[in-house]
């Protein structure tokens, strides 16, 4: 998993749970043809975690990078009655069939992303999110199609608030 190592230190320091589901296919089902078994697996995994831990509905984020960022953005905005926050890193697309609730969204993208060019995605995502009333933090950064540690730190602060001192 390319994403988890960037979030684990924050989870340990700030005291939150991480659920890291994997797609059933080479990438998330929505990328290759709509919601299917990945969404069902995510629902089941979230229900299993909720059966063992008390979850704060005001602090439940869907997060991901690249195709996972697109999936988090699409599923999180569609299910804003479940997710209070969305952290989308280098998301290429946002596919929202319907929207429930209005999760807060942290959207980050590298200015020189060679795989998913920023100009083809982030501005359009930001416009759609703002037009539909979402609280949006847009975080461009200097870099390619990568996860940047300080950006993840900002995303966690947007999710949980700044750390207490």
Report the location of each language-model feature.
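Short amphipathic alpha-helix adjacent to the substrate-entry channel of hydrolases
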Residues: 1-19
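Stable alpha-helical elements in mature extracytoplasmic
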Residues: 3, 7, 38-45, 68-72, ...
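Loop/turn elements at helix/coil->beta-strand transitions in domains of secreted/extracellular proteins
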Residues: 13-18, 56-60, 81-85, 101-105, ...
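Short beta-to-alpha linker loops that shape the active-site pocket of alpha/beta-hydrolase fold enzymes
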Residues: 22-26, 92
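Gly/Ser-rich "nucleophile elbow"/oxyanion-hole loop immediately N-terminal to the catalytic nucleophile
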Residues: 29-66
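Solvent-exposed, acidic/flexible segments
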Residues: 31-39, 65, 76, 98, ...
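Primarily recognizes the serine-hydrolase "nucleophile elbow" in alpha/beta-hydrolase
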Residues: 50-52, 58-102
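C-terminal catalytic histidine-bearing segment of alpha/beta-hydrolase fold enzymes
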Residues: 106-108, 114-165
